[in-house]
């Protein structure tokens, strides 16, 4: 039976502070349109079927609340999630500083140091308002041991690639757990996107 005959479901959780564009990224990926207004999310779930590296996948994407008062609810979603998109806004130093808190929360809930995750600096179309450099994002991702990219939900820059990369991370870690073989160093590569618009397209491994 071919790979395409199997429909594997991937549970992906979007995490980050309020107003960083988590919902905008998710809706751009699922529905291909940009939501401009900010309406704080409590919890929204979306599903999308797509082919990633010649293998059909069903993505179950959970968009979570960034506000502190929903921390307990967020932990429940983290417990059930397989992979995580950890989002900050390049226009907000505070949202970047909050990222480590969310990362530590996932570590505590999952009770392990390593889990499938991608670090995302969103709103890279707002270069003039940048408060967090691309290098800072790369360095933080390196300390987490995860891929990194900068995205724009508004201009649909590297949105699909980000979600695909989380699925690849889940697959990679599953294979490592199954085989416990080499687990060698993955090499850095760049997400290709013709519309750079000053955004960092690096994916650090």
Curated annotation (Swiss-Prot):
Known regulation of activity: Alternates between an inactive form bound to GDP and an active form bound to GTP. Activated by a guanine nucleotide-exchange factor (GEF) and inactivated by a GTPase-activating protein (GAP).
Subcellular location: Cell membrane
Gene Ontology MF term list: G protein activity; GTP binding
Root EC class: hydrolase
A biological process from GO: signal transduction
Keyword list, A-Z: Cell membrane, GTP-binding, Hydrolase, Lipoprotein, Membrane, Methylation, Nucleotide-binding, Prenylation
Short motif Effector region, span: 38-46
Residue positions assigned to the propeptide: 203-205
Similarity comment: family membership: Belongs to the small GTPase superfamily. Ras family.
Name of the featured protein: Ras-like protein 3
Taxonomic classification: Eukaryota, Fungi, Fungi incertae sedis, Mucoromycota, Mucoromycotina
């Amino acid at each position: 039976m071919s790979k395409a005959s199997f429909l594997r479901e991937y549970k992906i959780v979007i995490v980050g502070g309020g107003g960083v564009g988590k919902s905008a990224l998710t809706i751009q990926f699922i529905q291909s349109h940009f939501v401009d207004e900010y309406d704080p999310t409590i919890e929204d779930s979306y599903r999308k079927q797509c082919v990633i590296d010649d293998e059909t996948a069903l993505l179950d994407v959970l968009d979570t609340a960034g506000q502190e008062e929903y921390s307990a609810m967020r932990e429940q979603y983290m417990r059930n999630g397989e992979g995580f998109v950890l989002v900050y806004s390049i226009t907000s130093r505070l949202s970047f500083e909050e990222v480590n808190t969310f990362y530590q929360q996932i570590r505590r809930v999952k009770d392990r140091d390593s889990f499938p995750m991608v670090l995302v600096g969103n709103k890279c179309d707002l270069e003039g308002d940048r408060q967090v450099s691309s290098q800072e994002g790369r360095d933080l991702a390196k300390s987490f041991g995860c891929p990194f990219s900068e995205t724009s939900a508004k201009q649909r820059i590297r949105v699909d690639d980000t979600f695909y990369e989380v699925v690849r991370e889940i697959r990679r870690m599953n294979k490592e757990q199954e085989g416990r073989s080499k687990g060698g160093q993955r090499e850095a590569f760049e997400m290709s996107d013709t519309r750079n618009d000053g955004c960092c397209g690096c994916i650090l491994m």
